[in-house]
C-alpha cells in the first residue's frame, strides 16, 4: 500500500500511477482504504462499507453530494463534521430551520468561517490549533460530546481556550436522517 511510503514518495507514486493509467488507456481497478488515493487516482469511485456498496460516482460527486453519512465522513480530509439536531441539542447548538424529524447536519471543515456576534450559528471553545501555513485547522468543542474541525483562514486571530462564533457558507450544509441517509 502507498500508505507505507513517506509523504513525498507517496505523492510521486500516485502521479506515476495516474500517468500510467492515462498512457495505457485501459480500465484499471485500484483497491485502497485511503480516500486521498481514491480521490486523486479515480475517474469513478465505489465506496464500500463492510462489503456493501454505499455510493458510486466521480470523486467530485461523492464529495459534493454524499448519499449518506458514511460516504460524507469517509470522503474528505479532514472529514465532514456531523452534528445531531435533536431536542435540547438542536436548540442549543444550532439556529437554523431543520426537518421536523430527528436529523443530523454535516458541514465540511473548509466551509466554516469566523462569525461576528449575533450572526453565528455555532459557538464553541477552541481546544487545539494546527497552523499549516495556508490555513488553520481548529479543533473546537461545542459542548458535551460535540467536537468539530474548522479549516479557517490563517489570518484569523484565534487562540486556544478562546470561545469563538462560527458560521458556514450558505448551501454547503448536508442533512441526514436518523438512519444516516441524505435528506438534502
What do these predicted ranges mean?
Residues 1-70:
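ABC ATPase nucleotide-binding domains
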Residues 36, 60, 69, 80-81, ...:
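Glycine-centered loop/turn positions within well-structured domains
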Residues 49, 55, 74, 104, ...:
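Short glycine/serine/threonine-biased micro-segments
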Residues 58, 70, 84-86, 123-127:
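Residues located in well-ordered beta-strands
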Residues 64-88:
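C-terminal boundary and immediately downstream tail of ABC-type ATPase nucleotide-binding domains
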Residues 78, 89-184:
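Non-catalytic connector elements of ABC transporters
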Amino acid at each position: 500500500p502507498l500508505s507505507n511510503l513517506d509523504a513525498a514518495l507517496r505523492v510521486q507514486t500516485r502521479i506515476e500511477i495516474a500517468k500510467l493509467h492515462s498512457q495505457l488507456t485501459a480500465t484499471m481497478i485500484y483497491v485502497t482504504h485511503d480516500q486521498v488515493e481514491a480521490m486523486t487516482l479515480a475517474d469513478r469511485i465505489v465506496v464500500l462499507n463492510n462489503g456493501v456498496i454505499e455510493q458510486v460516482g466521480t470523486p467530485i460527486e461523492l464529495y459534493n453530494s454524499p448519499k449518506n453519512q458514511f460516504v460524507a465522513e469517509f470522503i474528505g480530509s479532514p472529514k465532514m463534521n456531523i452534528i445531531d439536531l435533536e431536542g435540547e441539542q438542536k436548540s442549543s447548538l444550532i439556529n437554523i430551520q431543520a426537518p421536523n424529524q430527528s436529523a443530523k447536519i454535516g458541514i465540511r471543515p473548509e466551509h466554516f468561517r469566523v462569525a461576528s456576534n449575533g450572526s453565528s450559528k455555532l459557538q464553541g471553545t477552541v481546544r487545539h490549533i494546527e497552523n499549516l501555513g495556508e490555513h488553520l485547522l481548529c479543533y473546537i468543542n461545542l459542548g458535551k460530546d460535540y467536537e468539530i474541525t474548522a479549516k479557517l483562514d490563517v489570518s484569523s486571530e484565534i487562540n486556544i481556550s478562546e470561545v469563538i462564533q462560527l458560521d458556514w457558507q450558505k448551501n454547503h450544509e448536508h442533512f441526514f436522517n436518523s438512519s444516516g441517509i441524505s435528506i438534502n
